[in-house]
Each structure stands twice: as structure tokens, then as C-alpha cells.
């Protein structure tokens, strides 16, 4: 299985309840498409290097995941691009 790390930045003015629902929904996107989540954790609210959609800071969330194919990652990528609560995301393949 290939190992990946997903980092995404959530808009800072989101309510705690909505943030938890967003994280649960995107974790479910991965698991429903065949990926195994090793770890899913919040980092912290951090200042951004430059403004993104008029925000100067964002809530960082990191997911470590294992998957056989890229279907789950492609679906995560597609949905995170159209979600207004996610400012940016990045998927990186980890060394085995």
C-alpha cells in the first residue's frame, strides 16, 4: 500500500461544529473510496504567508492515509477544490 499525507487549510472563521463536520465528511470521502486513515489530526491556527480569499490565517488539518490506488485521493482532490471552506490542500506521497 502506498502512503500519503494530505494537508488542508480550513477558513479561520468557521464554527467549531461546522469544522468537525467538514473534517468528518472528508475523512469519510477517503474511507468510502477504499483508503485507510492512519491518523487525522488538527494542527493549529496559523498565519498564512499571503492572503488567500481575504484570509490572513487558517486552520491546518493533516491526514496520513494508506491506499492501493489513487481513486480516493482523486475524489478528495475533486471535492476539496469545490468546497468553499477549504482554502488550499496538498497531497504528498510519502517514501515507503
Curated annotation (Swiss-Prot):
The record's Gene3D superfamilies line, in alphabetical order, gives: 3.30.70.60
Q: Name one Pfam family in it.
A: Ribosomal_S6
One GO location term (cellular component): ribosome
Q: Which UniProt keywords apply?
A: Ribonucleoprotein, Ribosomal protein, RNA-binding, rRNA-binding
Enumerate the InterPro entries for this protein.
Ribosomal_bS6, Ribosomal_bS6_sf, Ribosomal_S6_plastid/chlpt, Transl_elong_EF1B/ribsomal_bS6
Key word Ribosomal protein present: yes
An individual GO BP term? translation
Write out the GO MF terms. small ribosomal subunit rRNA binding; structural constituent of ribosome
Q: Does the keyword Ribonucleoprotein apply?
A: yes
Known function: Binds together with bS18 to 16S ribosomal RNA.
Q: Report the family membership.
A: Belongs to the bacterial ribosomal protein bS6 family.
Q: Give the protein's recorded name.
A: Small ribosomal subunit protein bS6
The organism that produces this protein has a lineage beginning with:
Bacteria, Bacillati, Bacillota, Bacilli, Lactobacillales
Amino acid at each position: 500500500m502506498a502512503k500519503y499525507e494530505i494537508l488542508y487549510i480550513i477558513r479561520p472563521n468557521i464554527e467549531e461544529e461546522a469544522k468537525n463536520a467538514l473534517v468528518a465528511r472528508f475523512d469519510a470521502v477517503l474511507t468510502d473510496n477504499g483508503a485507510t486513515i492512519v491518523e487525522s489530526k488538527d494542527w493549529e491556527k496559523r498565519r498564512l504567508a499571503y492572503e488567500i480569499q481575504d484570509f490572513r490565517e487558517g486552520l491546518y488539518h493533516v491526514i496520513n492515509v494508506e491506499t492501493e490506488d489513487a481513486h480516493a485521493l482523486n475524489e478528495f482532490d475533486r471535492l476539496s477544490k469545490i468546497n468553499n471552506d477549504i482554502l488550499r490542500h496538498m497531497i504528498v506521497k510519502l517514501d515507503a
